[in-house]
Amino acid sequence: MRSDIVKKGYQRAPHRSLLRATGLKDEDFNKPFIGIANSYIDIIPGHFFLNRYAQIIKEEIRAAGGVPFEFNTIGVDDGIAMGHSGMLYSLPSRELIADSIETMMNAHSLDAMICIPNCDKIVPGMLMGALRVNVPTIFVSGGPMKAGKLEDGTILDLNSAFEAVGAFAEGKISEKRLHEIECNACPGGGSCSGMFTANSMNTLCEAMGVALPGNGTILALSKEREELLRKAARRIVEIALDERKTEQFRFRNILNKKAVHNAFVVDMAMGGSTNTILHMLAIAKEAEVDFNLDSINAIASQVAHIAKIAPALSTIHMEDINRAGGVSAVMNEVAKRNASLGSHSADSILYLDALTITGETLGERIANAQIVDSSVIRHNENAYSPVGGLKILYGNLAREGAVLKVAAVAESMKEFEGSAVCFNSQEEAIKGIAGGKVKAGNVVVIRYEGPKGGPGMQEMLTPTSLIMGMGLGESVALITDGRFSGATRGGCIGHISPEAAEGGLIALIEDGDKIAISVSKGTLELLVDSKIIESRRTQWKPIKKEIKSKWLKRYSLLVSNAANGAVLKTEI
């Protein structure tokens, strides 16, 4: 066992002495040491109950013949950090989480791991850390929240609360109605109930085979979720007790090129958050898998969008997907669609021979999964769209790419030309939009919010929700080198690369410039004569924000742009 380096031999008597102080007995030194990477945090609705989950897992590990050691990571609640300087820390927290997983697991030479994430950056951070450690690892998330509901039957989620702010500002709803939405949008524990970033990433863990079936959709705080925890605990001990299985199920043997590909396929079929692109690119880099934005468009062109979930469809949430057959049913349906991409089976775009943590191939896992409700998960022949729910755009404004969640865009916005209204920060944009600077026919430009320029690549849910709440969602577009919450909907294009801080063309846009967006062509263009652009470039001086935080200053110096997953460079 890997842990023998800290528990075997006369030279390790001091190490065992310390371990005995924690309650270990003689017999425990012959058992596998299992790390439990928890993310229990009181302030996050998807995490405040995870201490109970860890207890269940620890009990089951002990009963199965292992020794559990729990440790914790940090986490940022993007909803609470939204719209103020707290959001600067959200994306950087992903790197801290990855580093902490690597540090704890390798410093103590633990044999295997269970990760308990749930929200936002915590899932990708743990995935990146697990790839570095490369021991058998199972992901079992906290689970999604139930959707909220008003007395009149209106279905709610967190996005409802954000958009209600814009509606209230415009006088479209009363203060009483705003309060009712506030009090009912998030009815209890769990990751926010739509196909936002947390649930998108938890779903992709199923697609990659690193989690058990149901990980992305079984509700938080349910008996079914508790059983999932127990199954994960029993399975990880079974693997850790067997030397052959320990080698077979090393994390990189599961999360490999096939797994990354399968994740993007499911992402397209379910219209996941645009953040998944950023995170999966970072995960691919950790896995040493060659994957780029062009690869994503190639997949999107061959995957039908068969599950539309909030924010794209406000009445459908993760509990509905679970009831309708879950992620396995989505994958089974996707697998039926003929496609030919790469070297995998010619009759499926999914790599059905990909290994999963249960020991089955992906094909074996999903073979018997069926769509129970085709109004929630559609069949291929009745898909919402013949192509995937996310699209990479290119053009003079995005030479290295930009991301659009096509699944949440109205038809009227898929071919759009408008005049620019420019803001050099999210804070400026929020004031400008709320103050009436943005009108129908405008393209809101929010720049210097990329990974370097922000720093930290803030999410833009507050400005996008204001636009929607003010009734401008089908007449105003928004482009940014920042990113969006998974709850964002509308003609919102993010991750523009190169970003303003590195001299991207977005930095040279002026108020009134015409900008053209074409989903059919996959383009994002500034319609300004090249000579004028060059003249502006000679006069351009980058806006350098004062960064007081030592951590954010280091992050700004080391981070790559969004097209490269916003990962930290290891060489300067």
Swiss-Prot record:
Its cofactor is [2Fe-2S] cluster; Mg(2+). [2Fe-2S] cluster binds at residues 119, 192. The keyword Glycoprotein does not apply. Pathway: Amino-acid biosynthesis; L-isoleucine biosynthesis; L-isoleucine from 2-oxobutanoate: step 3/4; Amino-acid biosynthesis; L-valine biosynthesis; L-valine from pyruvate: step 3/4. The keyword Transcription regulation does not apply. GO terms for biological process: isoleucine biosynthetic process; L-valine biosynthetic process. Binds 1 [2Fe-2S] cluster per subunit. This cluster acts as a Lewis acid cofactor. Its EC number is 4.2.1.9. It catalyses: (2R)-2,3-dihydroxy-3-methylbutanoate = 3-methyl-2-oxobutanoate + H2O; (2R,3R)-2,3-dihydroxy-3-methylpentanoate = (S)-3-methyl-2-oxopentanoate + H2O. Keywords: 2Fe-2S, Amino-acid biosynthesis, Branched-chain amino acid biosynthesis, Iron, Iron-sulfur, Lyase, Magnesium, Metal-binding. The modification N6-carboxylysine is found at residue 121. GO terms for cellular component: cytosol. One of its GO terms (molecular function) is dihydroxy-acid dehydratase activity. Mg(2+) binds at residues 78, 120-121, 459. Pfam families: ILV_EDD_C, ILVD_EDD_N. The active site is at residue 485. Transmembrane segments: none annotated. InterPro entries: Dihydro-acid_dehy_C (IPR042096), DihydroxyA_deHydtase (IPR004404), DiOHA_6PGluconate_deHydtase_CS (IPR020558), ILV_EDD_C (IPR056740), ILV_EDD_N (IPR000581), IlvD/EDD_N (IPR037237). Functions in the biosynthesis of branched-chain amino acids. Catalyzes the dehydration of (2R,3R)-2,3-dihydroxy-3-methylpentanoate (2,3-dihydroxy-3-methylvalerate) into 2-oxo-3-methylpentanoate (2-oxo-3-methylvalerate) and of (2R)-2,3-dihydroxy-3-methylbutanoate (2,3-dihydroxyisovalerate) into 2-oxo-3-methylbutanoate (2-oxoisovalerate), the penultimate precursor to L-isoleucine and L-valine, respectively. Homodimer. Belongs to the IlvD/Edd family. This is Dihydroxy-acid dehydratase.
